[in-house]
Amino acid sequence: DYFSKQPNHIAKLKDLIIKGKAGGTPSSTVAEYYNGDIPFLSISDMTKQGKYVEFTEKHISENGLANSSAWIVPSNSLILSMYASVGLVCINKVPLATSQAMFSMVLKDCNMLDYIYYYLNFFRETQIHRLLETGTQSNINADTVRDIEIPFYSNILVFVKTLQAIENRLNNEKDMLSRLMDLKTYLLSSLFI
């Protein structure tokens, strides 16, 4: 197991980011705060799109942004869910805003983006349960996220390239499967008309 090896060094997330903070949700009772031009990320967007988020279902307006604690998260930032689906992580490919349920991080070194993404996924599966605050809904807070320790190894770029190649292959196979399913549906509908 790669992450069970001894790391060269360990750094806390807060030491790897230029900016890291939760978002905010504009009041839902003010219609003018919504349906603007600013993409507004939801857990649903993250679960549907996976690693890279390229669009959002909801949008907020400039007024919605100004009248909440939401902020514009620049492209190629890491976004981690602190409430629902705790620990779910994505990389945004477009600037967007998030709710207070998400902690967004702008990294100091963009070359580490994929590595930290992969590590946070591993962390979610193996360790995040130890950090959960219990209550009506288990969650973590921003300070907990900032203090997550990230191990660094001498060959992480090779590791990342290997995982990216696997991801690319999986995505290609999913695309092929989707096309085959479409072809099957078309042929069946042609046969029975």
Regions found by a protein language model. Give the residues of each.
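Non-catalytic DNA-recognition/assembly elements of restriction-modification systems
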Residues: 1-24, 40, 154-155, 164-191
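Low-complexity, Lys/Gly-biased intrinsically disordered segments
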Residues: 3-49, 64-69, 130
